Amino acid sequence: MYAIVESGGKQYRVEPGKVFFTERILGKNEGEAITLDKVLMVKTDEGKLLVGKPYLENVSITGTIVEHGRARKVLVGKFRPRKNYKRIKGHRQWYTAIKVENIEVK
């Protein structure tokens, strides 16, 4: 069984027992339970495919927040030829790791 869920403006494929990384979720601490309600699609173990318009109302995904952290540094550079101008800037994006416990179809 797997599902497509929307979190942080992006879509993720999630399965029970797996960990996925999403944009940082504020207001929740590590170890707390979380419920994701914006489920776009579910494929059940019986092979049944449920698709929402845009979301499924009878499906919820429960999970646990594993950690909050920052991703690896991404370097962005500007360069102007023949002008002796060069600029490097780094960025580290915040993320939240969520372990999916259960996909419940009501």
From Swiss-Prot:
PROSITE patterns reported in the protein's UniProt record: RIBOSOMAL_L21
Keywords (A to Z) from UniProt: Ribonucleoprotein, Ribosomal protein, RNA-binding, rRNA-binding
GO CC entries: cytoplasm; ribonucleoprotein complex; ribosome
GO BP terms, alphabetized: translation
Bilayer-crossing regions: none
Pfam families noted in UniProt: Ribosomal_L21p
SUPFAM superfamilies for the chain: L21p-like
Keyword Cell wall biogenesis/degradation: no
GO MF terms, alphabetically ordered: rRNA binding; structural constituent of ribosome
Family annotation (InterPro entries): bL21-like (IPR028909), bL21-like_sf (IPR036164), Ribosomal_bL21 (IPR001787), Ribosomal_bL21_CS (IPR018258)
Quaternary data: Part of the 50S ribosomal subunit. Contacts protein L20.
Function as written in the Swiss-Prot or TrEMBL entry: This protein binds to 23S rRNA in the presence of protein L20.
UniProt record similarity statement: Belongs to the bacterial ribosomal protein bL21 family.
Protein name: Large ribosomal subunit protein bL21
